[in-house]
């Protein structure tokens, strides 16, 4: 599939680690010694990929799960499409109830972003994508927003389910990347994991509170935001952030390259399996994945794509306000280098 972002499977088995990690947004070379990967304490995990926990039931690192190709999803019939739209409308109401950090998007802006989403999908040979949810992120410095979209058939326009502020890569500091642009597939080939909720040396819970899910999109080419620029491999993830110190900063660029989201949005995407189509296919094949909690209310319309664009908007819209004046005062020294 031309132009689609490709990831490198450089982490066949990621060991568990005890101290708080941060999002992996720089290149790292893992050297195996006698067939055994280096342990976390042998590497600076604050500048590399945070390892997944080990499945306590099987003893098998979650990252070794083999992906299963989901069954192809045929176009929905008129009756099924109408049912899907009703489900989407119900999920929109659920989003309003469950996600505390929300943005109110004007109708014309909803439409414009839906058009931009379709254009980006078409550029990556996904023009016909329909019948599933898609996550869209605008990394523009003046916007910093995430949108969840759905359409039942390729003949429908993309419909907004909900929007929330994010924080993407802030250039200008060593090891900080611009959040990469493109269409990224959320697949068990880069297995998700969950936050330990412990603090790093700067007093920051880089992945948020305990049990927050880290959506791992693998190794991608990232544009360096320091020095002379250029590109390097970076580990691209979407995850929650410190709820006490950094979540209030959502709405401005503040990460090392990954997409930071609110805890309530993290839980919403997780609980309803918004981008878990490939994970659910793996479960349907008979695999048990510790990263998927029991009791989830997974939508039958789960998708698998996170799309990142840059609208290059010059001014900040009223619907995407800046964080409050006191937000930066809550960040401890060194807190702005934690992802």
Where are these regions (language model features)?
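Alpha-helical and His/Cys-centered functional microenvironments
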Residues: 9, 23, 146
